[in-house]
């Protein structure tokens, strides 16, 4: 990934807290924004933690991660965490994805 605009970067935690094939949720803006960061094949992905499939706002960080696909534990919707695209419904709206990088051991998100 190219260097991101430093003015817009937010450090969310240490890079070593996210092992491969694992998802970690982070709360930003006084818990108003939930973003998950996943590491797959040593690459980081950042996306909205809350599923778009309904009013329950189910956390995707508790779902099943298989490669770059994550499945909502509540309704079974599946998303591509690299693009945010819906792979399988009932969700119809994509996830918001964020640029993310590991800089000197710190995970930084452009959000």
State the predicted function of each range.
Residues 1-67, 81, 97-111:
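N-terminal pre-ligand scaffold of iron-sulfur
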Residues 54, 74-75:
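Short Cys/His-rich metal-coordination motifs, predominantly Zn2+-binding knuckles/fingers
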Residues 49, 75-76:
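Glycine-rich His-Gly loop
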Residues 70-72:
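Short beta-strand-alpha-helix junction that forms the catalytic/metal-binding core
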Residues 82-98:
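C-terminal structural segments of small proteins and small subunits
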């Amino acid at each position: 990934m190219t260097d991101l605009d430093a003015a817009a970067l937010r450090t969310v935690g240490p890079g070593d807290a996210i092992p491969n094939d694992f998802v970690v949720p982070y709360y930003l803006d006084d818990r108003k924004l939930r973003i998950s960061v996943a590491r797959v094949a040593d690459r980081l992905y950042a996306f909205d933690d809350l599923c778009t499939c309904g009013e329950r706002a189910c956390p995707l960080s508790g779902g099943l991660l298989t490669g770059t696909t994550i499945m909502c534990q509540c309704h079974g919707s599946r998303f591509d965490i690299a693009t945010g695209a819906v792979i399988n419904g009932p969700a119809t709206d994509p996830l918001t994805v964020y640029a993310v990088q590991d800089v000197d051991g710190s995970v930084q998100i452009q959000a």
